Amino acid sequence: MSGPLRIDWADTSLWPGRLGLTFAPGKRGVSLLHPGVMHTRDMAEDFGVLAREGVNVLAPLIEDFEFELLDMGDYHAEAGRRGIVLAPCPIPDREVPRDLAAFGALLDELMDALLDGRRVVVHCRGGLGRAGLTAACLLVQGGLGATEAVALVRRTRPGTIETAEQEEFVHTFETRQGGTP
């Protein structure tokens, strides 16, 4: 393990809750971005950080096979033990949401939590692409322009929104704004 789980909180007054981004808690195995690097996160310790930070809702954006690939077998049970509500919406790595209805429903669920003053954290494998896209869309839904939302997410967690397609998705989401992407 390489230190406590880091949650990067977006600095915004759009809602009374807090929006954070992180990487997959408890992930284990070979890094995709850094050859030779092994992830050895401790699931219980990472969820302990989430609980101490007061996280109420955790949105995993990874696909089902990634839970196995990253040796995250205790993920769902650990969330349950900590009283953290899971709001999953799988998105393929380095891509954009394919199921727009499901993604729109996720954004609405997370927005409701933020407006209720809860702490919401979104994550993908590395906490950059899918997590950044989702956080930026929430900021747009909350009232920011797409360019400002992307910039805020990138200030909050450098390297977020990894592909041009992901950034374009946020801008397209802004033009379609009305609650669904």
Please state what every model-predicted region is.
Residues 1-121, 134-181:
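Cys-dependent protein tyrosine phosphatase-like superfamily
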Residues 124:
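Short cysteine clusters
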Residues 127:
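Conserved G/P- and acidic residue-centered "switch" motifs that form tight phosphate/ATP-binding loops
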Residues 131:
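Ser/Thr-glycine-rich phosphate-binding loops at phosphate-binding pockets of nucleotides
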